[in-house]
Amino acid sequence: MLPPALNIPKWLEENSHLLQPPVNNYCVYHPSSPATAGYTVMIVGGPNARTDYHINTTPEFFYQYRGSMLLKTADTSVSPPVFQDIPIHEGSIFLLPANTPHCPVRFKDTVGVVMEQPRPKDAVDTMLWFCKKCGEVVWEKRFVCTDLGTQVKEVVEEFAADQEKRTCKACGTIAETRYQEGEIVQPPRFLE
């Protein structure tokens, strides 16, 4: 028998305490469940506390349920990388192409849904941090992602706990583990 549809307002009322920093995600449909056909569906709240760029080998589908978020992306095919910010407003959807470095910035009282395709067997995810001063990669970690609910958080925490990993080898700047107050402006809630 198939499970019932997930009512987002009711789920948030009963489970919003599960959306905790640094990632603030909760997998409502886990790929290990036979009912999901390998897909991962997460509810993600804000504010999150991360500055990493994640590279997934499959596309990611974003639906912004409440408020606006900012999806920071990086084109690493050029040096230095070219950065582009993509606002995703309430009620909007966005399909991020596979292998695009991205940093989802979520603000207070915002909620989104992210859906990811099943990853090919032994596909390697990458998380990396860029230097704000010179644009070089400060640190990166590659791993086979089997549980988005825990592994991304673990890598973010590993980076945050080690100043050597956070120090740019090119210029010596120490990378921040979260954006500073006022550093990133929340896009307007609704498009005018």
Curated annotation (Swiss-Prot):
O2 binds at R50. Pathway: Cofactor biosynthesis; NAD(+) biosynthesis; quinolinate from L-kynurenine: step 3/3. CDD domains: cupin_HAO (cd06123). Keywords: Cytoplasm, Dioxygenase, Iron, Metal-binding, Oxidoreductase, Pyridine nucleotide biosynthesis. It is an enzyme of class 1 (oxidoreductase). Its EC number is 1.13.11.6. Pfam families: 3-HAO. Its main location: cytoplasm. GO terms for cellular component: cytoplasm. It catalyses: 3-hydroxyanthranilate + O2 = (2Z,4Z)-2-amino-3-carboxymuconate 6-semialdehyde. Fe cation binds at H54, E60, H102. It is found in: Cytoplasm. Belongs to the 3-HAO family. Catalyzes the oxidative ring opening of 3-hydroxyanthranilate to 2-amino-3-carboxymuconate semialdehyde, which spontaneously cyclizes to quinolinate. This is 3-hydroxyanthranilate 3,4-dioxygenase. It comes from Neosartorya fischeri (strain ATCC 1020 / DSM 3700 / CBS 544.65 / FGSC A1164 / JCM 1740 / NRRL 181 / WB 181). The lineage of its organism: Eukaryota, Fungi, Dikarya, Ascomycota, Pezizomycotina.
